[in-house]
């Protein structure tokens, strides 16, 4: 039984800890049993089968999909500058589409705009993903992350160390469709559009 690192439980005696854990287990048991049953069913459908592997140097990977979460200090005025960039793009960073493994990127400011949380979901392993940023959208990366203290530049040999030093691995990582990549999604969209066009033309010619 691993001792909790929560400082609020520092004064908890061993009997109190055992009683607390037993109470928590009793409360969690019905839902845990349901999760276990769903996992047994999911094991028979490989399309839904996830994993809890490392994504490479840092982060977690489930199936084909990986996560990256990093927290860093923002330069004075950097949060306002980034907000202006986000307002101008209006949720459409077209250049980022060139990274064919990128699912999404999220930027969250906190501690009175002095720190930023960057979270992204992507396909494949960590090193390849960072290389894609460096080779396909270097200008966009430097435009955004130049507002972060200590950013060495995307073409710097130190950039991977910088990212890894600020990255925090997820304690839990769930993906609804862990085997579906960005390339798969785009292919499915093209197939759907082609089918819709075919059906529409068929109805028009009927």
Task: Describe the role of every protein-language-model region.
Residues 147-161:
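Short proline/glycine- and acidic-rich turn/helix-capping motifs at secondary-structure junctions
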Residues 106-149:
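Active-site/pore-lining binding-face segments in mid-to-C-terminal subdomains
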Residues 2-115, 124, 128, 157-206:
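Short S/T/G/P-rich N-terminal loop/turn motif that feeds into the first structured element of a domain
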